[in-house]
Amino acid sequence: MHRDFYIRLINREHPLPETFVPEHLIDIGLPFEAAPGDPKRLLECQAARAASQLFHACHRCGLNLWAVSGYRSFRRQQELFTGSPFVAKPGTSEHQSGLALDVSCPSIHMELSEKFSETGEGRWLKKNAPLYGFILRYPKNREEITGVPYEPWHI
């Protein structure tokens, strides 16, 4: 995969085509809310390796980080978009790239909510995600810039 792929901006102004599927998707093999075989357990291979390192470091700190959603196809995004006004339009979700991951923790029942930022896992992630090649992509008070509401669970 060309290295520019890893720095590509994906949003309303820079969508992915419907036919885009990452070349090297693998199961991240980490604590995951989804059952084995579910496509949302997949990430692009380099992102999966980085996520594995991030999760292991978090767990060594005594925290209980879980993955909730990784890769999402254009078609799956279309299904979710049809059912909710809060879901990104198909082609504009970073999940289609296989580089994005939603995370949560058992203390908030694996919810994807702002409450995650108040957990030990959320605070650890905010501080440490960049050490593993991830960022909190949709930070608080940056909605005008990102065009997306605050999502402390999305890396």
Model-assigned labels for residue ranges:
Residues 1-70, 74-155:
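Extracytoplasmic cell-surface/polysaccharide-interacting catalytic and binding patches
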